[in-house]
Swiss-Prot record:
Gene of this entry: OPR13
SUPFAM superfamilies registered for this protein in UniProt: FMN-linked oxidoreductases
Name used for this protein in its record: Putative 12-oxophytodienoate reductase 13
Family, as annotated: Belongs to the NADH:flavin oxidoreductase/NADH oxidase family.
Keywords, sorted A to Z: Fatty acid biosynthesis, Fatty acid metabolism, Flavoprotein, FMN, Lipid biosynthesis, Lipid metabolism, NADP, Oxidoreductase, Oxylipin biosynthesis
Length: 376
């Protein structure tokens, strides 16, 4: 069998990775009352492999930070609830990072949310978002401290490190992107000012747990929750350079969305949706060049072939898989064997059932021995 680039081992800092297939941080809406539940023990342990990296679902840093039914890590009870989940991953030899976040104006809680602005997310068919309160400059250190404490709590829960969530339209990105940030103080205006908050969070978290335990997720080209930027190339490269300078373990970047290509032939218009790698090859290349000291991860619509190509070409050190890993708990094995994949069921992504669409996806051999020790 030909070598599979995704299975080239690598070392970075204190960690040795047996393969380069990373579980994406996936919100699953099954942490009732913002508390990790026993069924998460099975879910994460199913996807753990020796020397494989897993990133937890986004985990709130304070009582106003999460969405409904997503976990937190600001209380002792939450820390204790995470411990058996982390232990189950470690029992399989996995490496486990906790993604920490604050949703900002994308909140679904009843309390008034905070943001870089006082403009709400535009109403959509699923949700009418509340009007946020513009975070005062003097309040920002408190939020930074919440991230710092959450990082310490994650390490106390046994996690190997933390990933700061700076992507997908949540609080830190609401500051970074000029499509949302309309401030006129030291946290708004210039690119450097808009990125100040996120970098101060990185500095505080790195000081608390060490930069070699810290990663950052960024999505310059994605406009979730109305969060867009006029120059995503500049934003991505600037943040990658600053993260590299700080010596964090990794930068995890999300590829641009698929785009519709329109062609006109003999007066007839044809619209075709093409892969982002066909339309904009190596769009993250500038970020990759700017971030060289640590691991550069890419994610967003990758499959086995594209992942192997990304690693083999040096475009990425590791590849983050979301929906494929969700539906295939043994995804590394399937990729190694080039075996068929389960199809994911989108309708169960965010339901609250502790089994259906969560821990009931079959293994390649339907071998549930890996599950039997962690039935909760």
């Amino acid at each position: 069998m030909d070598p599979v680039p995704l299975f080239n081992p690598c070392e970075m800092g204190r960690f040795t990775f047996s393969h380069r297939i990373v579980l994406a941080p996936l919100t699953r809406a099954r942490s009732y009352g913002n508390l990790p539940q026993s069924h998460a023990i099975l879910y994460y342990s199913q996807r753990a492999t020796k020397g494989g990296l897993l990133i937890s679902e986004a985990t709130g840093v304070s009582s106003d930070a999460p969405c409904t039914n997503t976990p937190g890590i600001w209380t002792k009870e939450q820390v204790e609830a995470w411990k058996p989940v982390v232990d189950a991953v470690h029992a399989k030899g996995g490496i486990f990072f906790c993604q920490i976040w604050h949703v900002g104006r994308a909140s679904d809680l009843e309390q008034e949310p905070i943001s870089s602005t006082d403009k709400p997310v535009e109403k959509n068919e699923d949700m009418d978002f509340p009007v946020p309160r513009r975070l005062a400059v003097e309040e920002i250190p408190d939020v930074i401290n919440h991230f710092r404490i959450a990082a310490r709590n994650a390490i106390d829960a046994g996690f190997d490190g933390v990933e700061v969530h700076g992507a997908h339209g949540f609080l830190l990105e609401q500051f970074m992107k000029d499509g949302v940030n309309d401030r006129a103080d030291e946290y708004g205006g210039s690119l450097q000012n808009r990125c100040r908050f996120a970098l101060e969070v990185i500095d505080a978290v790195s000081t608390e747990v060490g930069p070699d335990r810290v990663g950052f997720r960024i999505s310059p080209y994605i406009s979730y929750y109305g969060c867009h930027d006029s120059d995503p190339d500049a934003l991505g490269v600037y943040m990658a350079r600053e993260l590299d300078r700080r010596g964090v373990l990794y930068c995890s970047a999300v590829e641009p969305e698929m785009v519709a290509a329109t062609t006109v032939v003999d007066g007839e218009t044809t619209t075709t949706t093409m892969s982002r790698r066909m339309m904009i090859p190596h769009r993250l290349h500038g970020m990759r060049e700017a971030f060289r000291r640590g691991m550069f991860m890419v994610g967003g619509g990758y499959d086995r072939d594209a992942g192997n190509m990304a690693v083999a070409s040096g475009y990425a050190d590791m590849v983050v898989f979301g929906r494929l890993f969700l539906a295939n708990p043994d995804l590394p094995r399937r990729f190694q064997l080039d075996a068929p994949l389960n199809k994911y069921d989108r309708a169960t992504f965010y339901t609250h059932d502790p089994v259906v669409g969560y821990t009931d996806y079959p293994f390649l051999d339907d071998d549930r021995e890996a599950m039997s020790d962690h039935t909760g």
